[in-house]
Amino acid sequence: MCKEVIMSQKIIDLVTAVVAPAIPDPYELVDIEYEKIGSDYILSVLIDKPGGITVEDTADLTEIISPLLDTIQPDPFPDQYMLEVSSPGLERPLKTKEALKNAVGQYINVSLYKAIDKIKIFQGDLLAFDGETLTIDYLDKTRHKTVEIPYQTVAKARLAVKL
């Protein structure tokens, strides 16, 4: 793993530890991302709540989160960054077992560390998730197939838009 990826993950872990306990109900911390886009560093805090979040919600949450980031010592950020508090959008990441359990019945995209039947990316309806295995109904050309995917082989999962 390259040095920049390790540093980004350390920053994400530190920010998560500080920010997560401060997120009030009914909000949910969905994800934190720290990345360089062009010459700018962006710290994205993805928040959601039942019914979705509004622009006012993101402004209120920014007022909670921004001062907390200033309290982290020593300062973990190597350069100036922009704080972005936003909704995870339609294709929200599914990073926890709880998020996957809540996504049962929905259309998802799953990328794997290791291929199953020569396929590393599955997109289909999440039929079940028991905490260890995802069961997905996907389309192989014109035929529906079902695949069982061990949770530990999942590299990334997210909701997907069905076209």
UniProtKB/Swiss-Prot annotation:
Name of the molecule in the record: Ribosome maturation factor RimP
Pfam families: DUF150_C, RimP_N
Gene Ontology biological process terms from the UniProt entry: ribosomal small subunit assembly; translation
Gene: rimP
Organism, as annotated: Streptococcus thermophilus (strain ATCC BAA-250 / LMG 18311)
Xref: Gene3D superfamilies: Ribosome maturation factor RimP, C-terminal domain (2.30.30.180), RimP-like superfamily, N-terminal (3.30.300.70)
Subcellular location: Cytoplasm
UniProt function note: Required for maturation of 30S ribosomal subunits.
InterPro entries, per the entry: Ribosome_maturation_RimP, RimP_C, RimP_C_sf, RimP_N, RimP_N_sf
Family: Belongs to the RimP family.
A GO CC annotation given for this chain: cytosol
Principal cellular location given in the protein's record: cytoplasm
Keyword field: Cytoplasm, Ribosome biogenesis
PANTHER family: RIBOSOME MATURATION FACTOR RIMP (PTHR33867:SF1)
